[in-house]
From Swiss-Prot:
Keyword annotations of the record: Collagen, Glycoprotein, Secreted, Signal
Subcellular compartments: Secreted
Residues annotated as domain Collagen-like: 83-124
Name recorded for this polypeptide: Complement C1q tumor necrosis factor-related protein 6
Protein source organism: Mus musculus
Length: 264
């Protein structure tokens, strides 16, 4: 009787200790897919068949969950990953020129600049000149030949370019010269005088016979070279002519001067 009571008391104590374990230990719960798969029939399979020969019919796909999971995309902050500045790259090929733009407006006038430095001295300027003016106080009549008109009075003769002995001007420089001749005609006689360049008559001074004597003039410009001669001649007697003058006044004058010198 005591043995039975002892065993009964031990059984009660074990029950007290085992109850918390039974109710406290979690048990595995089958998922919806596992539950469905466990209830679906499987095909016939021999125990000796390898597992990889299982028919596709033996595998049952679990249904898709009705809940859609959100797609998670990671965000990377690029500024955090920015590196150091790289080296300068090589120069590229020049591009094609663009089209010409429209002309801009005229800008305002700039301020006056500073005075520049003085230049180096230039070469000395050479002034070329030549002039003469002579007169005659004696009348002249024509003869059998041409007569060179000589002069007995000098008004101007720079550097002696007019030869008083021959009555001719000798050009000292190449250039353009101006000449003028003034005479007084004789009563009832023609006046027939030429201005001559070397041996060529260039212009004539002429007056018809008249009861009264008058003043006549002629002028001309000539290009000359050094050594050229210009002089005055009276026509020969085949045409009776003459020019008048006296000891009191000078009626006959011959003048000339250089207008512009030319480089040789």
């Amino acid at each position: 009787m005591r043995v039975i009571m002892g065993i009964a008391s031990l059984g009660f104590l074990w029950a007290v200790f085992l109850l918390p374990l039974v109710f406290g230990v979690p048990t595995e719960e089958t998922t919806f897919g596992e539950s469905v798969a466990s209830h679906l029939p499987k095909g016939c399979r021999r125990c000796c068949d390898p597992e990889d020969l299982m028919s596709s019919d033996d595998t049952v796909q679990a249904p898709v969950s009705p809940y859609v999971l959100p797609e998670v995309r990671p965000y990377i902050n690029i500024t955090i990953l920015k590196g150091d500045k790289g080296d300068r790259g090589p120069t590229g090929t020049p591009g094609k020129p663009g089209k010409n733009g429209t002309r801009g407006d005229r800008g305002s006038q700039g301020v006056k600049g500073d005075k520049g430095q003085a230049g180096s001295p230039g070469s000395s300027c050479q002034t070329h000149y030549s002039a003469f003016s002579v007169g005659r106080k004696t009348g002249l009549h024509s003869s059998e030949n041409f007569l060179s008109l000589l002069f007995d009075r000098v008004f101007v003769n720079t550097d002696g370019h007019f030869d008083m002995a021959t009555g001719s001007f000798v050009a000292p420089l190449r250039g353009l010269y101006f000449f003028s001749l003034n005479v007084h005609s004789w009563n009832y006689k023609e006046t027939y005088v030429h201005i001559v360049h070397n041996e060529q008559a260039v212009v004539i001074l002429y007056a018809q016979p008249s009861e009264r004597s008058i003043m006549q003039s002629q002028s001309v410009m000539l290009p000359l070279v050094p050594g050229d001669r210009v002089w005055v001649r009276l026509f020969k007697r085949e045409r009776e002519n003459g020019i008048y003058s006296d000891d009191v006044d000078t009626y006959i004058t011959f003048s000339g001067h250089l207008i512009k010198a030319e480089d040789n």
